[in-house]
């Protein structure tokens, strides 16, 4: 499209701020982002700047759970209460002090996904023949006389490509070292996810989370149909080749999702599949943890700490 043929740049790349009006999602602010290439997705301002529903060329890619969008005021922090506000979406963020199994003082997947962003802004600019937009915000996970962590997020795209770039910088603003755990919960569901969907991953050493995952290893490469066994499977992939980036592809034969992440700071890839009637989802999860919870990581000597004033940079790229 010739730039001289349009009166408003929103025709090419649009960012609109909206607010949910009813139910448990009432009051949640979001940015709805669309581009000429066919991307259409929501950035959930009040849920750690995660990505909610995501469509490509009008077709839904992301998973939508039973709860839908839930305001963080309803967050239940203990045990598995996180699941009561997990609406799915394309990207949920887990951490910053806890990822995985609940343990003393820490519920499933930590607090960050239920923390609203602040210092919010967006901008749009031309760089040559490309119109770019960037949305940014910062989440603070803090406690008086406790942790004082932030996660500063930038989400970027242009008008011509079906690509999204995310850059996060975590920082410890406190005066003592802080446990630091981070996971990106990238969720795909129907109608994109269908039986026979291929999952192409880096060559890895595979660690099974339990006997069910060990007994269904083939499901990690080819997603089956729902099962009366009500399978809930989790694998951890440790890429054999060390590099600054790794790439995974999910291909249903018609559409593809390509995920590239900074494997120097996210060295493990979790893979979760829920294969139950009316519960059908695939999640790929770049992380710096083993998904066993903070207590397990501490006992195993693998718990990562952020020193005072230390920063931790991670990046993701999604291509469709």
Predicted regions and their residues:
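Surface-exposed acidic/polar loop and edge beta-strand patches at domain peripheries
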Residues: 1-165, 176-179, 188-225, 237-320
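C-terminal beta-strand-rich structural cap/linker in extracellular carbohydrate-active enzymes
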Residues: 229-233
